């Protein structure tokens, strides 16, 4: 059925980990979706990042660009962007913390990740509940400027510390 999702991989964090990697991207489909929820760092005020994986290893080359709009319930909207980065920012720039009820949730769509001859790109929709109770959201995208390698997955990590217990990351094929 067109528009269906097939679960490929899921990681449920049962003890704090430095990173989570989802694998299973192959040449079967061109579009994949990642859903994450209840993502919280074990160190206060951290930003969540992502990197594509090549042969199961997160790519750390400075060939990633991203831009998005930050929508804040308690302040003016903001824009953020970066070129030639070694990672793509996922969560709100002010960071997610360890206070009760703070968490990040979101959806990414991945395009051309399985194509070795094309740039890979993603779209992002993410929401955060901050320690102040402010709801924030991000909407934007990023590009992985590598047209010589196919990607087989995607990894997530915080700028510092670990991803805490209870986070769920799921990779789907979009069919």
Regions found by a protein language model. Name each.
Residues 2-175:
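Surface-exposed molecular-recognition determinants
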